[in-house]
Amino acid sequence: MPNDNRLAPAALAAQAAALPAAWRHVLEQPAVARAFASVLGHVEQRLAEGAVVYPAAPFRALDQLAPADVRVVILGQDPYHGPGQAQGLAFSVPDDCKCPPSLRNIFNEIAVDYPRPTRHDLSAWTRQGVLLLNTSLTVEDGQPGSHAKRGWETVTDALIAEVARDPSPKVFLLWGAHAQAKQALVPADAGHLVLAANHPSPLSARRPPVPFVGCGHFRQTNAWLQQRGQKPVDWSGEQNNASRQGEFAL
């Protein structure tokens, strides 16, 4: 039986209200508040009409991270639209789910330089300051992109811009044209690193202009962070094993 990851009525508003203050401040900006109200109204209407909406926790990517805690940003587009998949973290699925093709290619790229991750749930990355943010935070069952034009991008653009305004050094990993369009939200003089490549989907991972396969983003990210006095990210997801930390250093 798949994990029940359906969004419950009224849960979206409650989760937004429970976000850390730094994120709530973004949602309270007038233009963002209007966009979120539009999203919220549409989601609640669709739930009332019997639609199945995923995930159960749309704001999960923000729950444990304030903007100052973010060290790496990985942008996705749409939550997974099948039952038991989407968790509120871009690219992540529960461990008992089959590994999606894009995530498999991400793991293949990590394995070039580091131990291959064994868990499909990427929560361990989040605990290390990796923001796994989709640009649309809800989707209907079997209908990819179904909420993409309902106001979510105004909300998530504002969240990305807030992260980029924070002065602590961050790496933005922009995979595919959709994510790369968000580079405009990261000021060139902000002191952050932006790395771009094709999307890890099998349809594009090996294609020009910058194939995802062989991009080296995970090692480049760690090298850049360490040069600025920060710990490397344990991309294997086993950061609690201190004896392995050296495997992720330069």
UniProtKB/Swiss-Prot annotation:
PANTHER family assigned to the protein according to its UniProt record, in alphabetical order? URACIL-DNA GLYCOSYLASE
Q: What is this protein called?
A: Uracil-DNA glycosylase
Q: Which residues form the signal peptide?
A: none
Tell me the compartments it is located in. Answer: Cytoplasm
GO CC terms in record = cytoplasm
Q: What is its EC number?
A: 3.2.2.27
> Is Hydrolase one of the keywords UniProt gives this record?
yes
Function, as annotated, reads: Excises uracil residues from the DNA which can arise as a result of misincorporation of dUMP residues by DNA polymerase or due to deamination of cytosine.
Supply the source organism for this entry.
Bordetella pertussis (strain Tohama I / ATCC BAA-589 / NCTC 13251)
- Superkingdom field: Bacteria
- Matching NCBIfam families: PRK05254.1-1, PRK05254.1-2, PRK05254.1-4, PRK05254.1-5, ung
Give the catalytic activity: Hydrolyzes single-stranded DNA or mismatched double-stranded DNA and polynucleotides, releasing free uracil
A Gene Ontology biological process in which this protein takes part is: base-excision repair, AP site formation via deaminated base removal
Keywords, comma-separated and alphabetical: Cytoplasm, DNA damage, DNA repair, Hydrolase
Q: Could you say which protein family the record assigns here?
A: Belongs to the uracil-DNA glycosylase (UDG) superfamily. UNG family.
The keyword DNA repair is assigned to this record: yes
List the active site: D78 (proton acceptor)
Cross-referenced InterPro entries: UDG_fam1, Ura-DNA_Glyclase_AS, Uracil-DNA_glycosylase-like, Uracil-DNA_glycosylase-like_sf
> Could you cite one Gene Ontology molecular function of this protein?
uracil DNA N-glycosylase activity
Locate the region Disordered: 228-250
Q: Which Pfam families match?
A: UDG
